[in-house]
Amino acid sequence: HDTGIGAIMWGAVIAICSLVKLSEIQFGYSLPFDIYLLTIVAVVPQVFITIKEKKERKVKSFDDAYMDYIWLGFGIGIFLMIFIINSVFSVWGPVAAEYRELTGHASPFSFREFIAPLFLLLYGLPTFITGAACKFKPMLWGGFFCWVCCIITIYTTIKIDLLLTAASAIMAWLIPGILMEREYRIYKKEQASLHV
């Protein structure tokens, strides 16, 4: 039984980061740091949550090991995608500046408009697999919701992309996490009553 705490945390962190970034764009201000750095900070409690949950497990099944590797692969994939995107931005920045200098206006192509679909594609994969493997429909549908939003964000502006990313985090992780946590509490009460 997963406690759901990790899913709640990641759903909240990604939703908050997306909504704060949207607010920065909408209202024309800038925080002194990139709000998405909170995701790096969130790795620390995730490690502690994972260690605590592993200690509470009496037996580690094949399914548990399989899920651990799926989510580890997801984390590595996200890290690599961020690295690739930052590498592309480091090359694209000077090209865009030169274009502006030569033409007198910004390039009609904005690379950041195409980042959200990539993240939503990745968000959906382990979420969908976990939901299907664990027969937990809220997470299965959350993964599917990420993929629908992935397709939509190809055709929308960055502001809509950020709203859909926040909605995806809520649908894929926050709500399923809350439901898992509720089931976990019920399970723990039942286990406690059996050992009385």
Feature locations, PLM:
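Transmembrane helix-loop junctions in multipass membrane proteins, especially transporters and channels
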Residues: 22, 26-30, 54-58, 90-98, ...
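Selected alpha-helical membrane-embedding segments in polytopic membrane proteins
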Residues: 2-88
